[in-house]
Amino acid sequence: MPPKKAPTTAKKAASGPTHTSYRDMIKDAILNLKERNGSSRQSIKKYVLANNKLAPASQNAFDSQFNKAIKAGVEKGDFIQPKGTSGPVKLAKKQAPAKPAPKKPATTTKTAAPKKTATKKADKAEKAEKPKTKKTNAGVKKPAGRPKANTAKPRKASTAAPAVVDKPKVVSVTKSGRKTTTTAKPTEKATKKTAKNKKA
């Protein structure tokens, strides 16, 4: 006889729910109902039941799951109840994430560099001005002191040069009528004067 097959003990995996979470269903209902002041709980429940395949459950079980989903959504900031817990439900506006403050460009080092160059230029300008002041000081002549007494011994009087005596010119007329000029010999007085000067 063929052996009997062992009975399979593995149970079939239970089929999960065919609908999304209650919170997502409520979000979808509010978006589609498009009411300005929010949607009432009754209208949201009707939309959820009509558009989702829910497992058969009692009305009390559905209401408890529905209320829990709204409460959790309010705590997480998904829903708003402006008129209290029994009032209409609205979707909370998501705040845009705060933009990080723009980083300041690192210009401190760049701005510091021109200052250094400016100080260097100023130092160079000061150095360039200093020689000018020295030159001006050098250019100013010191006041002349008292003239030094001439201590040098008086030089001997230079020997007088012999006096040049103009030789008198004698004009004579020849027989033919021509004029001739001849220098006369110096007189004895002139020769004596020159002799005295030489002795002195």
From Swiss-Prot:
Residue ranges of the region described as Disordered: 1-20, 78-200
Q: InterPro entries given for it?
A: H1/H5, Histone_H1/H5_H15, WH-like_DNA-bd_sf, WH_DNA-bd_sf
Composition bias of kind Basic and acidic residues appears in: 120-131
UniProt GO BP: chromosome condensation; negative regulation of DNA recombination; nucleosome assembly
Q: Could you list this entry's UniProt keywords, alphabetically sorted.
A: Chromosome, DNA-binding, Nucleus
Composition skew (Low complexity), residue ranges? 1-14, 94-116, 159-185
Instruction: Tell me, in a sentence or two, what this protein's role is.
Output: Could act as an H1-type linker histone.
Its protein name is Histone H1
Supply the source organism's classification: Eukaryota, Fungi, Dikarya, Ascomycota, Pezizomycotina
